[in-house]
Amino acid sequence: MTEEQTNDIDKLNRQIRNKYIKNIEIWKSLDDNTLYDKYIECPSVKNKINNLKKYLKETNITEEQITNIIKNKAFCLEFLIPPGTKGAVRGNEFNNIIKNKILSFTFLDEDYDIQFEKKCINLATDEIPDFYILNTKLNKAIIGMNQISLIGGGHQTNRASKYILHNKSNDDNKTICLIAEYPKLIKSKNKTYKIFSKGFENNILLYLSDLESIIKEYFKIE
């Protein structure tokens, strides 16, 4: 690796870190321990807990021991709460954080149509966006995709490729992707480097603290 490449990577890592630090409380709010009470309220998890209680009662384990097992947070997180449930709850929580932030922007007046989880007629997307902000006078829109992480593989990586590396933004429509996770240190000019480098350069990949400035810049709001 050349010195120039190393400098580019170091610069990007600092940029990611500086942006993430401003949003660290959001990431903490999406932690398993923070969301635990919401996890165990999910019907699928309640069924697992009830089934476990039933099976344990058929053994010589006492009621007190059963209660202690069920109340063991670490045990439940590892064995009773599926990754899919965690992902769904965490995703919904992240969506709500972003929704509340957008609705708090008083500068988005009656000229703006703000919608959540609806298709935007201005720009066709493969999936329903998490939100869009449409200036009805200018007929310009920001279309938002919320993704806690873009580097976890599978669906996350595909989304990154679609909305960052192959972004279809134009003069009238801008597609952006909001994230929450702090990625592992980037050590080479790999796909993760390309995602963050292009995303930051074009203001299409961002943490929540940058959303207000990007909206104002795009719609030229003073």
Whereabouts are the PLM-identified features?
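Active-site beta-strand-loop-beta-strand hairpin of nuclease catalytic cores
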Residues: 126-127, 132-143
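Solvent-exposed, charged helical/coil patches
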Residues: 78-107
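Catalytic cores of nucleic-acid endonucleases
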Residues: 147-195
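Surface-exposed cleft-lining segments at the edges of enzyme active sites
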Residues: 80-88, 114-121, 146-154
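Domain-level recognition of nuclease-like catalytic cores that cleave nucleotide substrates
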Residues: 179-222
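Structural alpha-beta junctions
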Residues: 104-109, 168-175, 196-210
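Nuclease-adjacent, charged terminal/linker segments that flank catalytic cores
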Residues: 1-73, 81
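A short acidic/basic microdomain associated with nuclease active sites
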Residues: 103-124
